[in-house]
Design a protein with these regions (language model features):
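Hydrophobic anchor residue at the start of the ABC signature
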Residues: 49, 77
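Conserved catalytic motifs of ABC-family nucleotide-binding domains
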Residues: 56
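Conserved ABC ATPase signature
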Residues: 35-39, 43
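A short, surface-exposed alpha-helical micro-motif characterized by mixed small hydrophobic
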Residues: 102-104
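Conserved ABC ATPase "signature" region
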Residues: 12-30, 139-140
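ABC ATPase "signature
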Residues: 120-121
Length: 161
């Protein structure tokens, strides 16, 4: 609860801050009285983001924040996180297996294998000039929406074998 972060906050002030938090993530104050089972997965995630931002953190940790969401709401949440990161000058640790999302959101990437860091660096460098074989294999396994590029990747893989 908010009073653990702001013990001197009045109920009215807390109510206003909560409403502002919901509005910031694109929800209305109508959501205040709803139970989790009355919300969609995307709405639950938006409420979770609003709650995480209430104490005005300098660091936001997002662990698979969009992995279980439909593509349409996933894009909205990604855009929201990018906006929040920029507007609030927030440091964000974004944990994900979806490399397309990682590439869109992250400035720096850490690649882990069996719980150990195998490579790290600026996102574009890691994605386009991986230094470790594990990272290169991981990136080459990502499906490419363009069938011609997917075919090129397949040919390169089979020629390397």
């Amino acid at each position: 609860p908010l009073d653990s972060f702001f013990p001197s906050m009045t109920k009215e002030s807390a109510q206003k801050d909560i409403e502002d938090g919901l509005i910031e993530v694109g929800l209305t104050s109508d959501y205040l009285g709803r139970y989790p089972h009355e919300l969609s997965g995307g709405q639950c995630q938006l409420v979770a983001i609003a709650r995480a931002l209430m104490p005005k953190p300098q660091l936001l940790i997002c662990d698979e924040a969009v992995s279980a969401l439909d593509a349409s709401i996933r894009g909205e949440i990604i855009d929201l996180l990018l906006r929040i990161k920029s507007e609030k000058k927030l440091t964000m640790i974004f944990i994900a297996h979806d490399l397309a999302v990682v590439r869109k959101i992250c400035d720096r990437v850490i690649v882990m294998q069996s719980g150990k860091i195998v490579e790290q660096g600026p996102t574009e460098k890691v994605f386009f000039e991986p230094e470790k074989e594990y990272t290169a294999n991981l990136l080459s396994a990502v499906p490419v929406p363009d069938p011609r590029k997917e075919k090129e990747k397949y040919i390169q893989r089979t020629q390397a074998e």
